[in-house]
Amino acid sequence: YYAEETLIGGYDLINEPVLPNGVSLEEFRQLYIDITDAIREVDNNHIVYIEGNWYGTDFSGLTPPWDDNMSYSFHKYWGETSLATIQSYISMSNQYDIPLWMGESGENSNQWYYEVFNLLEENNIGWNFWTHKKVEKISSPFSAVVTPQYQTLIDYWSGNGSQPSSAYAEAALISFANSLKLENCISRPGVLASLTDPDFGEVSKPYSDHSIPGIIPAAEYDIGAWGLSYTDSDYYNNGDGNYNDGWSFRNDGVDIEANSEDDEIPYTVGWTDAGEWLGYTIQNVTPGTYDLKIKIAAPASGGIFFAQLNGTNLAVIDVPNTGGWYDWQNVLIPNVEVSSGEQFLKIQIM
């Protein structure tokens, strides 16, 4: 059916195989050969992609190649981003003069994406990102919202709600299907930039259109690599667990929490550690002298942070006890002189 279809790149024969007990590597290889032979009876045009054992990571028993138009396809998740992590695949490719394809990777932070996918491209390895759209997640370029009607179905399925009528269930499913349309999804521009913007690792770019005078939400720090737009002590999952505590709005290590109590600022930054900082490029500037107010909340005193504008220290702030994590107070940095032109505001935890 697909033999003459040029829109089809090839056939990935088995996705993320894991050999059951009792199945040998020889049998595994022979299965791949048998499938390839069956394809070649009707199609000599398309690539066959061969994934290794253990979720596409182990190619033991699968060399040498058995077809002139095949590629070894590996997956990469939750590990370090160094060349050493893919060197065995590169060596296999060089030894047998066969192309590599990284068929699946994702489910991590923007910095991890940037480092991994640049590593692949530097070594001439094509790649595929998993995945372009998920449901209420920060780790994909687009995120679909669960509608209230569909949530009612979820509650019923999980045993936490009464059974809806069939008409309601059908309407709920349709509402969620509409929510999945790309035009109805939430965009995650930082994710897309980490994958496609060649400047991501070189230039800090504004997340949104900040102005002076104006309000700058803490969660709307710049888009860019770790060390350019922000720093965070835990900024990707290298196999030892999560990289985020808030799991809202942005996909960096910066820990952001949804703030349902404030429509003006729906997200807040928390779980901060010493040395972490956030940077904000401000392009719409009216020069003058301003008071800088920073809204904070803390259940105890003792925290310290400082603010810089274009590299000049503005003040060191001792964080007071405001009464709780959600009891907000403004701290004031008065008489800040702002010149014309683009500004860079930096807030750093001490």
Residue ranges and their predicted role:
Residues 3, 63-64, 69-70, 81, ...:
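Alpha-helical protein-protein interaction elements
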Residues 112-210:
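Aromatic-rich peripheral "rim/lid" segments of glycoside hydrolase catalytic domains that contact
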Residues 1-2, 11, 32, 49, ...:
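Sequence-level detector for tyrosine residue identity
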Residues 15, 21, 44-45, 53, ...:
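Detector for Asparagine
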Residues 194-350:
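Extracytoplasmic
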Residues 30, 87, 95, 111, ...:
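Residue-identity detector for glutamine
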Residues 56, 68, 103, 114, ...:
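Intrinsic disorder/low-complexity segments enriched in polar/charged and small flexible residues
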Residues 3-134, 139-155:
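Extracellular glycoside hydrolase catalytic/binding regions
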